[in-house]
Amino acid sequence: MSTAAAPRGDGPPSPARGSRRYRSVPGLAELGDGRISYSERSMPLLAALAARFRAERPFDGLTIAACLHVTAETAVLVRALRAGGASVRLAASNPLSTQDDIAAALTARDGVEVFAKAGVDRDAYYEHIELALGADGAVGPDLVIDDGGDLVSTLHTRAQPAMLGRVRGGCEGTTTGVLRLRRMAADGTLAFPVIAASDTPVTRLVDNRHGTAQSVIDGLLRASGVLLAVKTLVVAGFGACGSGIAESARALGARVVITEVDPVRALDAVLRGFRVLPIAEAAPIGEVFITATGSTAVITAEHLAMLRDGAILANAGHFDVEIDVRALAAMAVTVHTDVRPHADAYELPDGRRLLLLAEGRVVNLVAANGHPPEVMDLAFGIEALSLARLAGSAEQLPPGVHRVPPDIDAEAARLVLTTLGARLDTLTEAQQAYRDSWRLGS
């Protein structure tokens, strides 16, 4: 977090109460502002939405609590929401992913309350989330936007009932978070509607497959420096994220092995030319491992004991539970920290060394800068449009997890296609009549 200066932007200025926990380094805000401006140039959808929101003011008088990775792309989203009149309070969605220069810029340049700092412990992480919700006496949020479900779960377990009752609705941007929220809805806990922004055809294609693939490989290479060509690389999970990672690794020359529990996804992997094995059989032959399941205990002590000397471990899931880091630490006789930036070498009693990247946390945001701006432009554009819909018509949605309205998904795709110079055909009257009729046959 960073100290406040004169606020800039369209939303109401607010004092940065979180600044008392973080003193900005001189010049940090200027550095962050430059990086935000660079990303803005590659995010035309949010630029268009900011202009629309500035005219329509869908968030006038509303407070939005956000729990997101504090990156330059997130800052562009925050500025778009403020253009629509929102007051925004931002906490990080991962203890290690905050880019402090971006936090400083949002606080000093935009007057946003940012409760985030890179490298905080678990207690401080959740304290920041509570501050973003208004735990220090501030008015609670009208809308929420989450990335992993920590903010929404904290709101339900630690907030006052009056604060929970104030929330009109929210958005969740990750598959992991959507799964958590669906479990909350199933047991009757979820008290307001949440739109699953990650669960759309557009997001699965652009964000999960292309964005995650590129940024995870980027983080892996930055942290390890490994040559992927001819390496045996094991990807745990072949969903939208895992399949994209596998394709990208194969394109760089890796020999990719897939582990899966879902027979349909496993069949998909086989038909795309990948070898599919149980993790217990993949462990002894793998040289690089990337977990992308959204589950827990994927690589356990049993598997760690099988790994060859020099094996590299990276996690692409939202939480640090896919690789059993505690078991790895217990097995090691020595831990050589920071042998490379964001890479720790665990030396085992028999002399083997295993390289753990980003402490087992999400490697693309800890060891790299996350998704490219073009990817986050579309993902955040869908969330911004969904929040605007909730701001005006949340009473039409019951508590629970809801899909992104199809018209929002299509609108976001059309706007991005326009910025890319692509043009679509339209159905003729005859084609539309054919689609609408059941009488026309062979």
Feature annotation, model-predicted:
Residues 15-18, 27-45, 59-63, 71, ...:
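Adenosine-phosphate binding glycine-rich loop
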Residues 68-78, 84-85, 207, 211-296:
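Glycine-rich phosphate/diphosphate-binding loop of Rossmann-like nucleotide-binding domains
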Residues 86-98, 257-260:
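Short internal beta-strands
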Residues 92, 143-148, 160-175, 304-347, ...:
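ADP-ribose/adenylate-binding Rossmann-like module
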